[in-house]
Amino acid sequence: MSGIDFKQKISVQRPFGKPSSAEDEYEITRVFESDRGRIVNSAAIRRLQQKTQVFPLERNAAVRSRLTHSLEVQQVGRYIAKEILNRFKQDKKISAYGLDKLLDPFESIVEMACLMHDIGNPPFGHFGESAINNWFTKQMDPNGGGAEPRGKDQCLVNTLKLREGETELNILRSKIRQDLSHFEGNAQAIRLVYSLLKLNLTYAQVGCILKYTKPAYWSGDIPTSHNYLMKKPGFYLAEEEYVKDLRRELNMGEFNRFPLTYIMEAADDISYCIADLEDAVEKNIFSVEQLYDHMVQEWGETTHGDLFDKVVGGAFRQLGRGQGRRSSEDQFFMYLRVNTVGKLVPHAAQRFIENLPAVFSGSFNQALLEDSSPACKLLQIFKKVAVKHVFNYPEVEQLELQGYRVISGLLDIYSPLLAMPQTAFTQLVAEDSHREYPIETRLFHKLSTKHRLAYAESTERLRHLSPEQHEIYEYYYRARLIQDYISGMTDLYAYDEYRRLMAAE
């Protein structure tokens, strides 16, 4: 397979500071060890311990948080990476693929991407995400955009309303209305590491968490060749120039992926499907015996020695055999995890290698664990059981509805900051106070320093723009400021903050 050279992809360069001159193996490894240190010690990773996996506001430490889930994904990602590299070694392809000095970085990039993959998720998971998008959609009317007004503009933000004869400005307004109405955890992760936390990670490390390749402002048809890669927003307008630099540095086509991202995605798929079921048993939603019946029902007719019998049946037959050493539930899930990982990891590695040219270029338009194989069927039945019997459980649904209300309520509470005239908000930022806006001043004081600094830095770069463009972009970064602050909260902090500000305690 000529043309595959991982030296073109695993770049040691960073967006800030002088270019790296690392050439020997240990120098290159040190670059990515620095990435590891920056990531592991970041506040975003620590906050994962109080963010929802499936069960919001969970007090039982045995039930997974985003952090414990991410640690499990990290381990599976490392395993897949090692499996791929071992097969390259067996086929004597290490040198041919430019990996002589990159074996440790290959693994490290995957591991750290797995650890980071959920850092952009807001409180209360997908329901928090939906709350942000629905709130901003009502404000923005993103589908009413265009180059010229068409009838009554339903946008509630005067700065972003379309105006006759302002074609270029209307295109910008429409783009920003789309962008702000499409908050997405993966795009927020890119924003976190680059704009908010300023971790200055290598382009390769950040490229590995660019899971989807569509900008959040996208409003046109999606090319069929990239309909999977572009099914969700992957980055915001605010980070567009950075993503362009990243693509140049990593030799990525416009809507293509970084090759190691496929491994991170497969590790997540393998990990969460088992974890959600184990947590459901821990929460007494169903017993192991009931879970087994649910899985048999989804699989259909089983035969002795088929994949279901080996993986799920094999685990079920271990029930009770470990008594005195561990509980029957622990026994079952230990074997289920071992059996599942033992089958799906080699399958993911094989799919990576079989499709290497497309994977390397980043144009492979599906997940590694998305084919007609029994391994993928097994993964799908795990997911179906979770959807049918876990996600719609009354306790889960009630907590998700509470989470939706909390995030929507916080956006309502902080919305006066978005309603301020540009000049007044600029004065508030500069002076940390505004006598005519006492409520807004107090709300502004509650915003975190790093988010306020990111806003100030972004608006500082707008000086060269026309007054009309400046006003539009200023509102954009102000809305981003509110999204950044609320999405960065933990579940418990968001819940407590909402109760405090609603005078409910």
Curated annotation (Swiss-Prot):
Coiled coil, from the record: none
TM regions (residue ranges): none
Gene3D superfamilies recorded: Hypothetical protein af1432, putative deoxyguanosinetriphosphate triphosphohydrolase like domain
Domain called HD: residue spans: 66-273
GO MF annotation terms: dGTPase activity; magnesium ion binding
Highest taxon in the source lineage: Bacteria
Cofactor: Mg(2+)
CDD domains, per database record: HDc
Enzyme nomenclature, EC number: 3.1.5.1
Keywords noted in UniProt: Hydrolase, Magnesium
InterPro entries referenced in this protein's UniProt entry, alphabetically: dGTP_triP_hydro_central_sf, dGTPase, dGTPase-like, dNTPase_1, HD/PDEase_dom, HD_domain, PHydrolase_assoc_dom
Any one GO biological process: dGTP catabolic process
Catalytic activity: dGTP + H2O = 2'-deoxyguanosine + triphosphate + H(+)
Pfam families the UniProt entry points to: HD, HD_assoc
Subunit (UniProt): Homotetramer.
Function: dGTPase preferentially hydrolyzes dGTP over the other canonical NTPs.
Family: Belongs to the dGTPase family. Type 1 subfamily.
Protein name: Deoxyguanosinetriphosphate triphosphohydrolase
Taxonomic source organism: Yersinia enterocolitica serotype O:8 / biotype 1B (strain NCTC 13174 / 8081)
